[in-house]
Design a protein with these regions (language model features):
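Formylglycine-dependent sulfatase
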Residues: 1-141
Length: 141
């Protein structure tokens, strides 16, 4: 396959019993994951730290973001949800497929492998909207 480590995780059905984030706030954590290193290394560790023209954070030219690496391995890449990273970037370079609410994932599946960053509705305050039978008990093993 194109991504033997990711394929191995998927094939073996790994369940993560403990998960950790790279930062205590969402934008810094999301930025670190997509860059592949601690947000402190590139200055993106403060929540929404690259917002204005004067405060933009530019990554070094030799940095490749995870979706760019996936594209090089033959994947279609898309983002459905948050893409506010703590650095300046070219959205069209990072994601090569424009996803909309009517995109058929089966259609994507048969064209080529895809890497999608997907944020579902939810967040910190919306857990009361999830029906009880769909909630996951983190203590189950």
């Amino acid at each position: 396959g194109y991504t033997p480590n990711i394929d191995s995780i998927a094939n073996s059905g790994v369940r993560f019993n403990r998960a950790y984030v790279t930062a205590p706030v969402c934008s810094a954590s999301r930025s670190a994951i997509i860059v592949g290193q601690s947000a402190i290394r590139f200055g993106g560790h403060q929540h929404r730290s690259s917002r204005t023209k004067n405060t933009r954070i530019y990554l070094p030219e030799n940095y490749k973001l995870l979706p760019e690496i996936m594209q090089e391995s033959g994947y279609t890449t898309f983002n459905h949800g948050k893409n506010d990273y703590n650095f300046y970037y070219d959205l069209k370079k990072v994601y090569n497929h424009k996803l909309n609410s009517k995109t058929d994932f089966q259609d994507l599946l048969f064209k080529q492998p895809f890497f999608g960053q997907i944020q579902t509705k939810g967040g910190k305050n919306n857990t009361s909207n999830i029906s009880k039978d769909l909630k996951v008990n983190p203590n189950l093993r």
